[in-house]
């Protein structure tokens, strides 16, 4: 059985190869065709409609912390007006505006322990098996670890609803608005990628 490091290296290589092949195929044939458009539209409608255009992220860096081989940049950025996402950016030593590195966004697990969010993949809390962001930073990747809605710093701001109760509340709030949590999660993921793309 491969070690975690060997597994990450092999899956990263496999994912890169797959992405390269998909890019080559995408350049030769359109992703959306007359045949696929109706399904695509139904799927989008079922999720809650089109996502808003990405606006200014208004990033704020809160603090920096040095670790062995990389630094943690605690930050937040705007997802939608009035909704900010706390996140941790892991930057390997030696990476700068002039010496860049590949970047990836990693989300925490979604299996019950709602108090945990970005700090688990960043290697600061929780199960070491899930410290994937820290492992990738040690391999030279810039890693963004954001909090998903209802986790860690994005739990009930009034502190009335805990864990799953707040998640059910948010689920119903989006459903009543004609959307769903998947729509919101995809929007948040898109904004995380917008943040990574905005870096030098």
Residue spans for each PLM region:
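Alpha-helix capping/hinge segments and adjacent helical runs
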Residues: 35-52
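Short, cationic motifs built from Arg/Lys/His that form the positively charged side of catalytic pockets
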Residues: 4-5, 149, 199
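N-terminal export signals
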Residues: 6-26
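C-terminal segment of N-terminal export signals and the immediately downstream linker at the start
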Residues: 1, 21-38
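Short beta-strand element of the alpha/beta-hydrolase
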Residues: 99-109
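N-terminal cap/lid segment of alpha/beta-hydrolase-fold proteins
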Residues: 56-96
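Cap/lid segment of the alpha/beta-hydrolase catalytic domain
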Residues: 107-187
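Conserved acidic catalytic loop of the alpha/beta-hydrolase fold
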Residues: 188-200
């Amino acid at each position: 059985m491969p070690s975690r490091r060997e597994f990450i290296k092999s899956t990263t290589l496999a994912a890169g190869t797959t992405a390269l092949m998909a890019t080559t195929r995408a350049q030769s044939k359109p992703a959306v065709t007359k045949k696929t458009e109706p399904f695509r539209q139904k799927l989008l409608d079922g999720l809650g409609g089109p996502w808003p255009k990405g606006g200014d992220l208004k990033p704020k860096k809160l603090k920096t912390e040095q670790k062995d081989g990389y630094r943690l940049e605690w930050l937040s950025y705007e997802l939608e007006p009035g909704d900010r996402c706390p996140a941790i950016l892991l930057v390997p030593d030696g990476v700068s505006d002039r010496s860049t590195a590949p970047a990836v966004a990693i989300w925490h697990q979604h299996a019950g322990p709602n108090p945990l969010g970005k700090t688990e993949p960043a290697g600061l809390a929780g199960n070491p098996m899930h410290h994937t962001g820290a492992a990738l930073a040690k391999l030279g990747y810039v890693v963004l670890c954001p909090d998903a809605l209802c986790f860690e710093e994005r739990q009930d701001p009034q502190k009335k609803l805990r864990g799953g109760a707040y998640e059910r509340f948010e689920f119903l709030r989006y459903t009543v608005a004609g959307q769903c949590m998947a729509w919101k999660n995809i929007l948040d993921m898109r904004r995380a990628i917008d943040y990574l793309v905005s870096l030098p």
